[in-house]
Amino acid sequence: MQRTLSIIKPDAVKKNVVGKIIDRFESNGLRIAAAKKVKLSKCDAKAFYAVHSERPFFNDLVEFMTSGPVVVMVLEGENAVAKNRELMGATNPKEAAAGTIRADFAESIDANAVHGSDSLENAINEINFFFAAREIC
């Protein structure tokens, strides 16, 4: 059993599609082991996305991720990292396959509805960023 981190981003929270996105995960074999709604501070967003700090989009990403609440979740299941990424679809919703979360709920490459860990190693680090072990069950 594998775990991964998912973030439902401010655009999707604002559009009130959190339940629809969670349903996609659950109906495709991923179980929610932990979840909470949080408002990221700029400091939190910069730390979480530090890997992108030298990229030209970094400041816009931080601004976007702090523009409203997000829902962070630990998803659990067989090949959870790959399954979550498959369900999310391509980063750019215009390139995302029909029926994926981003194709159905995202507006743009920036406001793309969801974040998901891109590797098992990053999943562990990202989960630990948001959750204490006692919060995951």
UniProtKB/Swiss-Prot annotation:
Q: Where does ATP bind?
A: 9, 57, 85, 91, 102, 112
InterPro entries linked: NDK-like_dom, NDK-like_dom_sf, Nucleoside_diP_kinase, Nucleoside_diP_kinase_AS
Q: Which NCBIfam families match?
A: PRK00668.1 (NF001908)
Gene Ontology CC, one term: cytoplasm
Per its record, the protein catalyses: a 2'-deoxyribonucleoside 5'-diphosphate + ATP = a 2'-deoxyribonucleoside 5'-triphosphate + ADP; a ribonucleoside 5'-diphosphate + ATP = a ribonucleoside 5'-triphosphate + ADP
Q: Which cofactor does it need?
A: Mg(2+)
Q: Which PANTHER family match?
A: NUCLEOSIDE DIPHOSPHATE KINASE, NUCLEOSIDE DIPHOSPHATE KINASE DDB_G0292928-RELATED
Stated EC number for the protein is 2.7.4.6
Record bears the keyword Zinc-finger = no
What organism is the protein native to?
A: Campylobacter curvus (strain 525.92)
Q: What class of enzyme is it?
A: transferase
Signal peptide stretch: none
Active-site feature positions:
115
Q: Which PROSITE patterns match?
A: NDPK (PS00469), NDPK_LIKE (PS51374)
Which BP terms from GO are recorded? CTP biosynthetic process; GTP biosynthetic process; UTP biosynthetic process
Purpose of the protein: Major role in the synthesis of nucleoside triphosphates other than ATP. The ATP gamma phosphate is transferred to the NDP beta phosphate via a ping-pong mechanism, using a phosphorylated active-site intermediate.
Single GO molecular-function term? metal ion binding
Compartments reported by the entry: Cytoplasm
Q: How does it assemble?
A: Homotetramer.
Kindly provide the name given to this protein in its UniProt entry: Nucleoside diphosphate kinase
Write the record's keywords in alphabetical order, separated by commas.
ATP-binding, Cytoplasm, Kinase, Magnesium, Metal-binding, Nucleotide metabolism, Nucleotide-binding, Phosphoprotein, Transferase
Family to which this protein belongs: Belongs to the NDK family.
